[in-house]
Amino acid sequence: MNIQALLSEKVSQALTAAGAPADSEAQVRQSAKAQFGDYQANGVMAVAKKLGMPPRQLAEKVVQLLALEGIAEKTEIAGPGFINIFLDKQWVASQVENALNAPKLGLTPVEPQTIVIDYSAPNVAKEMHVGHLRSTIIGDAAARTLEFLGHNIIRANHVGDWGTQFGMLIAYLEKMQNESANEMDLSDLEAFYREAKKHYDEDADFAERARGYVVKLQGGDEYCRQMWRKLVDITMTQNQINYERLNVTLTKQDVMGESLYNSMLPNIVADLKAKGLAVESEGATVVFLDEYKNKEGEPMGVIIQKKDGGYLYTTTDIACAKYRYETLNADRVLYYIDSRQHQHLMQAWTIVRKAGYVPDSVSLEHHMFGMMLGKDGKPFKTRAGGTIKLSELLDEAYGRALKLIAEKNPQMESDELAALAKVVSIGAIKYADLSKSRTTDYVFDWDNMLAFEGNTAPYMQYAYTRVASIFKRAGIQEDTLTQPITLNDEREFALATRLLQFEETITSVAREGTPHVMCSYLYDLAGLFSGFYEHCPILNAENDDVRQSRLRLALLTAKTLKQGLDTLGIETVDKM
């Protein structure tokens, strides 16, 4: 049930009946304060201005024509023409019943789209580091959310698996295998990469061999392809361990690296030339874009092929967008890439649109994000200024969570403690990021993220166990609750109304790619449940009808918290 959508439709109908143009916006919003009702329609002022009519007069006309019988208890006009809508308690109670009994908490079924989500994108022969964290967990939350709504999701892990560095990596892998009879496991990819680079810089014969391998690899040489595949496989096997630890849904089957588009690049350059979009300039092939100007105010040149015949990231990104539309049949493509890549992506997509590779009906969206900073406000690094490996960050989170939980639960068995620390530590890292607006930089702070108070994963996980434990404690099965829901106390009504706003929240998250909106909703919901729990006795209610009604409200709260956290990729536990 999407109350906002329902009320928007009703207010729009009343506006049209009152003489407003058919496309007039109702601007229905959740009210910030209870005295202004549960929802507010703010669109009257703008429409009245268009009609040359006093806003209050139009508001009165709209209220008379509003068909909200059985939905709203009353409507009031406030100020110059705001319409405050107070929902009917019985109607809200009946909608809560529906949400409890329907699949997916009563969400309105969507028209399924094929949505490609580009996220994570680590590099081959390098270990994942904290810089990969935001794309990985924000992108995964988007994938889970849209999948839950009923869309067909294609996860695309745009791995950096191509480039001139592979000549040096293949040459070094060959050297290592010749020197060691054991099969390489590349347990420390960073050290492997550093050693390969050192040999390349210091050994002329090695460098010559490496350059030769680049040419052979690009020409499809079978030996080089085999060595290259080995490097990709070793890297992605190691990355998969990180994904599984993070409770991220990416698998090896989702790898769609840069190399996937290699065969398309010559044809794209030829086609852009044929269409008059690309021209030769100083030996390179360039697309000049009027939409972007250089310092002299002239159209900016975007190189798609270098003098030496090599291609650039832009060329690959053009091919990638074309492939996602033509081959994957995408209706919508979301890119979870940091904000520094914005202009690069916009230029690639401008070329894509001009060339007719992807129609305007297919949405290409850059869901950019800011940086992860340390407490000093600088990019998050080790004390020595080095990059923090993702696996080391996860190890530290686990160690901290284990210590914290052991202090709070000295009697807990060690295996139970370990399982709980795993769930809490991963939840804490993910929620700390997801609860901040993705477009801003955020400060990584261990103490805040592992706190059991405030808008944190441990607090949210505890809030869920608190609700779930009511049923456990009393030995109640949900199918034994048959009495209807009644909302006589204002706290019952506030909780019920907020529960029904789950669909509005998840719809907004799906549209904008903003998981922090879900985090805020869940935190607010947990707070409302806390107030309800303290002031409205559940198991000790005055009679069985009230007891069952409150238990059913608690049940929907538990289901909503669990489902909401699941869309973020955060697990819940039954005991904390």
From Swiss-Prot:
Keywords associated with the record: Aminoacyl-tRNA synthetase, ATP-binding, Cytoplasm, Ligase, Nucleotide-binding, Protein biosynthesis
Enzyme Commission code: 6.1.1.19
GO biological process, one term: arginyl-tRNA aminoacylation
GO CC annotation, single: cytoplasm
Ranges spanned by the short sequence motif 'HIGH' region, renumbered to the chain: 122-132
Presence of the UniProt keyword Cytoplasm in the record: yes
Substrates-to-products reaction catalysed: tRNA(Arg) + L-arginine + ATP = L-arginyl-tRNA(Arg) + AMP + diphosphate
Main localisation: cytoplasm
Keyword hit for Chloroplast: no
Localisation per UniProt entry: Cytoplasm
Pfam families the UniProt entry points to: Arg_tRNA_synt_N, DALR_1, tRNA-synt_1d
Molecular function terms, GO-annotated: arginine-tRNA ligase activity; ATP binding
InterPro entries: aa-tRNA-synth_I_CS (IPR001412), Arg-tRNA-ligase (IPR001278), Arg-tRNA-synth_N (IPR005148), Arg-tRNA-synth_N_sf (IPR036695), ArgRS_core (IPR035684), DALR_anticod-bd (IPR008909), Rossmann-like_a/b/a_fold (IPR014729), tRNAsynth_Ia_anticodon-bd (IPR009080)
Subunit structure: Monomer.
UniProt similarity note: Belongs to the class-I aminoacyl-tRNA synthetase family.
Matching HAMAP family: Arg_tRNA_synth (MF_00123)
Protein name: Arginine--tRNA ligase
Species name: Pectobacterium atrosepticum (strain SCRI 1043 / ATCC BAA-672) (Erwinia carotovora subsp. atroseptica)
The encoding gene: argS
